[in-house]
Amino acid sequence: MKVTGSTNITVRKLIRNLEKSKKPLWRKVAEELSIPSRKRPYINLYKINEHTKPNDIVVVPGKVLGIGKLDHEVTVIALDFSKSAIEKIRASGGQAMSIYKALETFKDFKGRSVRLMKQ
């Protein structure tokens, strides 16, 4: 069976842009997005809450779901968010940002604690 990659055109363009950035973090995210969508991670907020400290940046190469709550401020960068996840992230004082926007906003993460969460 031939491996074709993502069939979603916007995800394919995003993968290309991430690979062009030449930053190790964005290249790893591009590699994670290249897997089939059924194998992409779905991360709940309680997992993000467990594994982060205040003012951390979390990158999720999949979808963030709204189960659980955040008790500290976190910037979450993901391919997709559920509505409840966005509301809870903002209620805790954090920021929910798409990978598209983060690629333009964050040129480098010097001095910031960044975590790539897959499961």
Swiss-Prot record:
Q: Which residues form a coiled coil?
A: none
Gene Ontology CC terms: ribonucleoprotein complex; ribosome
Matches recorded under InterPro entries? Ribosomal_eL18/eL18-A/B/_CS (IPR021132), Ribosomal_eL18_arc (IPR022947), Ribosomal_uL15/eL18 (IPR021131), Ribosomal_uL15/eL18_sf (IPR036227), Ribosomal_uL15_CS (IPR001196)
Q: Could you name the domain of life of the organism this protein comes from? A: Archaea
Example GO biological process = translation
Keyword check for Ribosomal protein, yes or no: yes
Q: Record's family? A: Belongs to the eukaryotic ribosomal protein eL18 family.
Q: What's the protein here called? A: Large ribosomal subunit protein eL18
Q: Which organism is it from?
A: Saccharolobus solfataricus (strain ATCC 35092 / DSM 1617 / JCM 11322 / P2)
